[in-house]
């Protein structure tokens, strides 16, 4: 018997050592790739621009948070406590918040332009900076319009600004060799051409065809299966990391998809009935893989609170409250997360971890799936409990969060020590 127990402990130790070595290799490879990416001019300019835009973004994020929790008609606290607040000009307030989101993107484009052209040793940056600032306005806003879609299109803004900067660099270098005034007619022609492209793209991105198609796709029964949920857990962090805006169903409460509605109808008809879709985006992905936003980044805010660098501690405190309510934009700009391989790997790992544990707990009947509707801004860490009234879900949530902290910790430790792009 003692030999059997000893042999078992030896096998466990071998497995543990194997996974430990594999983890170290993955972290080292990811860190090397991250350092390679941080040598790219466009990435350097983008990361610096995001960090410099962070104060304005913080104002925007907290204003939206107050609106979502208290001011809007379907705000979380208004719904939970049945408050009857009469707030004048609610619609105008929402419009102002939408405009503020676009203004953040405009500042991001202008700051990126100045940073990138400085790296390119271009001295006359006023016109291209102003052009990309106005171009972003024309890209997202039409005459008398406010955006009714997700404006978190960071990749689009950075790419268009990058192309504009490169065209200005070569235009100035090879066409305008006599170094005319910054607002010479030949440069104004270039600016007009860039703005014309932005206006043309505006009519393409405001079309709802793509967004409607994605919403319809996510309502497909495929995303109630194990493979479908795993696919979402990998693709969603990847797209968010790339700076591509995600459908509402992947960043907020997807209680309007067909599977959730059918489950709710079944429960309301007969509380003891078998659910047609016990595993779906709402009961698995949102409830267990979205803590703090895409990639379960609430763990990052928690880790940063204990960082040895004051700057990172401040970022952790600044981002903690929005992260509790599923908003990780401050982390996205503050670290930044954009195009950083070092942060993509743990984002996918934690997202997959939450999906695997949540899915397993539901199919083994360890917990009840979330079927009851919750307000849109409900913290994802509470959806499993509030949507099922099953206290065991809180235990699963705690386990997933603790494991997420363990996964993120070595990556954040390396990120904290990497300041090459800041230099």
Predicted segments with their positions:
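Juxtamembrane inter-helical linkers in multi-pass membrane proteins
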Residues: 23-32, 257-273, 312-332, 375
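Juxtamembrane non-transmembrane "cap" segments at the membrane-aqueous interface
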Residues: 254-266, 353-377
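Short terminal hydrophobic/aromatic SLiMs and anchors at protein ends
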Residues: 5-6
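Central hydrophobic cores of alpha-helical transmembrane segments
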Residues: 125-135, 243, 254-256, 321, ...
């Amino acid at each position: 018997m003692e030999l059997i127990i000893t042999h078992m402990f030896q096998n466990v130790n071998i497995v543990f050592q194997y996974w430990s070595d594999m983890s170290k290799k993955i972290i080292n490879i990811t860190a090397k790739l991250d350092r390679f990416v941080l040598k790219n001019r466009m990435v350097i300019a983008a990361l610096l621009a995001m960090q410099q835009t962070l104060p304005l973004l913080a104002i925007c994020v907290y204003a939206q948070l107050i609106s979502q929790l208290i001011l809007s008609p379907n705000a979380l606290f208004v719904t939970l406590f049945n408050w009857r607040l009469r707030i004048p000009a609610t619609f105008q307030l929402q419009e102002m918040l939408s405009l503020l989101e676009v203004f953040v993107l405009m500042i991001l484009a202008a700051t990126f332009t100045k940073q990138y052209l400085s790296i390119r040793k271009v001295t006359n940056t006023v016109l291209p900076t102003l052009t990309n600032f106005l171009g972003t306005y024309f890209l997202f806003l039409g005459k008398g319009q406010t955006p009714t879609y997700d404006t978190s299109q960071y990749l689009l803004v950075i790419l268009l600004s990058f192309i504009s900067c490169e065209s200005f660099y070569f235009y100035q270098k090879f066409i305008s060799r006599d170094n005319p005034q910054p607002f010479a007619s030949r440069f104004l022609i270039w600016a007009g051409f860039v703005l014309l492209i932005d206006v043309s793209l505006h009519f393409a991105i405001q079309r709802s065809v793509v967004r409607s198609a994605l919403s319809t796709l996510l309502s497909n029964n495929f995303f109630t299966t194990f493979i479908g949920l795993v696919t979402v857990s990998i693709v969603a962090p990847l797209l968010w990391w790339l700076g591509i805006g995600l459908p509402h169903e992947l960043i907020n409460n997807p209680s309007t998809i067909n599977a959730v509605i059918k489950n709710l109808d079944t429960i309301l008809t007969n509380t003891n009935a078998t659910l047609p879709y016990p595993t779906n985006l709402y009961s698995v992905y949102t409830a267990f893989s979205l803590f703090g936003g895409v990639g379960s980044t609430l763990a990052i805010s928690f880790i940063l609170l204990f960082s040895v660098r004051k700057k990172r501690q401040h970022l952790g405190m600044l981002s903690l409250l929005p992260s509790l309510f599923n908003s990780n934009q401050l982390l996205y700009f503050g670290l930044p997360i954009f195009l950083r391989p070092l942060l993509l790997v743990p984002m996918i790992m934690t997202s997959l971890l939450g999906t695997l544990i949540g899915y397993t707990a539901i199919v083994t009947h360890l917990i009840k799936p979330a079927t009851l509707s919750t307000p849109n801004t409900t913290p994802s860490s509470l959806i499993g409990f509030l949507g099922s009234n099953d206290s065991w879900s809180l235990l699963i949530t705690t386990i997933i969060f603790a494991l997420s902290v363990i996964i993120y910790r070595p990556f954040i430790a390396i990120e904290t020590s990497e300041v090459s792009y800041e230099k």
